[in-house]
Amino acid sequence: KWPKAIVDLRSPSPVEIGFALVVRHAVPKNLDFLKIDVDSYDCEYLKAILAAGYSPKAVDIELTPSIPPPLKYMLKWNPEYPVFGSILGGCSLSMAMDIIQPYGYTLIQYAMEDGWFVKDEYAHLFGSVHPDPTDLYELGNPDHYAPNIWTGNLNGSSMVEELVHLRGNPAAMLARAQDGIRKTIAESHLSDDLQRMEYI
């Protein structure tokens, strides 16, 4: 159906995807659209692709709704523990913004689990865009849907609501999120592997 589409189901590291796989498939540096949805190291892939000089006009990246702005979170690549689809996988909207904004991108929407960015020079085509991540997070996820990270005794939606109510106290918000992640690791049957995972 899409003769130029390339599907590669291997699990390369972000460096491989940024510097080898994309090059091997002759993806143009100024591609029109980039979609990242790997259920794990999404922001590591984004960093590698942008650092390699690729400049898509639009980017759609899956971002975990479990970590609301302004918290910054991402699972870091570790070749010894390539846990794709981990409950700790993913990247927060605020972390993605830190990565992509220096490359000249504007956030135009956050639709529950996907952040949509366009090059700054195209932002005017989308009308009056208010690119504040907190506002767009609330518009795109008004019920505070949170499918991962908060497991066991932690209800996803209520945990996100608790974090959102702590926005006025960043230290308390961060401490509560860290405590929640520790509880998720402790309650998980994958706790040995998760203890070895690195996240920011």
Question: Where in this protein do the model-derived segments appear?
Answer:
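Short, conserved beta-strand edge motifs with alternating hydrophobic and charged residues
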Residues: K35-D37, D60-E62, Y110
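S-adenosyl-L-methionine
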Residues: K1-C43
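Conserved hydrophobic/aromatic beta-strand scaffold that supports enzyme active sites
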Residues: F33, A58-D60, D114-W116
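Hydrophobic/aromatic beta-strand patches that form the interior of the parallel beta-sheet core
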Residues: P3-V7, V59-D60, I108
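A short alpha/beta connector and helix-capping loop motif
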Residues: E44-P82
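Rossmann-like AdoMet/SAM-dependent catalytic core
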Residues: A20-H25, P70-I200
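Generic detector of contiguous secondary-structure segments
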Residues: I36, Y41-A52, P102-Y105
